[in-house]
């Protein structure tokens, strides 16, 4: 499939989903990332064998330099997964915290920073509501000039990002409660157990 085609990611994801159909209990696929997650080492060998068979049957080529086998922690979609924890990758934290203030004075720079902040959204409660004054700066009708409150907010967010808590994976066989809420200003949810 050629690069740059608008629907290419969706078509490729559908192809990968079809290839790995029936393995959802132990294999997660996102575009070209394949994550095998067993309960123990014995299962890991079985699941890897199954994954390799599927790749071979479907002509999928794996890069030996990108393979990580039998590791307890893995980087996946901007997070570090392992030991029943989910942490934001340090390079993303650094990029958010060290984003230059002069770049935040432009609409393009502010949008870019807000986009990177989406990686931290799961770690900071009510982040959307907290950032609403900055989002209004990127709208066609909003006030464009940054004021002292905006800079205080940016410094606060940068501080929060540098001290993020680790998220925890729910224990096996626990009851999970999903609390949701919505209003005119936004919506949100939290998973409790």
What name fits each language-model region?
Residues 1-193:
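Retroelement reverse transcriptase polymerase core
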């Amino acid at each position: 499939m050629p690069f740059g085609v608008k629907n290419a990611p969706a078509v490729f994801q559908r192809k990968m989903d079809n290839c790995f159909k029936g393995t959802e209990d132990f294999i997660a696929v996102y575009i070209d990332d394949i994550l095998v997650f067993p309960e123990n080492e014995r299962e890991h060998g079985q699941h890897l064998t199954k994954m390799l068979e599927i790749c071979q049957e479907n002509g999928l080529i794996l890069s030996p330099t990108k393979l990580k086998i039998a590791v307890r922690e893995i980087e996946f979609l901007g997070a570090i997964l392992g030991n029943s924890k989910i942490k934001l990758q340090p390079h993303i934290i650094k990029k958010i915290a060290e984003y230059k203030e002069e770049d935040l004075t432009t609409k393009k720079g502010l949008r870019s920073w807000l986009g990177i902040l989406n990686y931290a959204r799961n770690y900071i409660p009510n982040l959307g509501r907290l950032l609403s004054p900055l989002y209004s700066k990127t709208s066609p009708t909003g006030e464009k000039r940054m004021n002292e409150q905006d800079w205080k907010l940016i410094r606060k967010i940068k501080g929060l990002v540098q001290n993020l808590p680790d998220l925890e994976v729910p224990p096996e066989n626990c009851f999970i409660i999903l609390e949701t809420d919505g209003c005119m200003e936004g919506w949100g949810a939290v998973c409790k157990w």
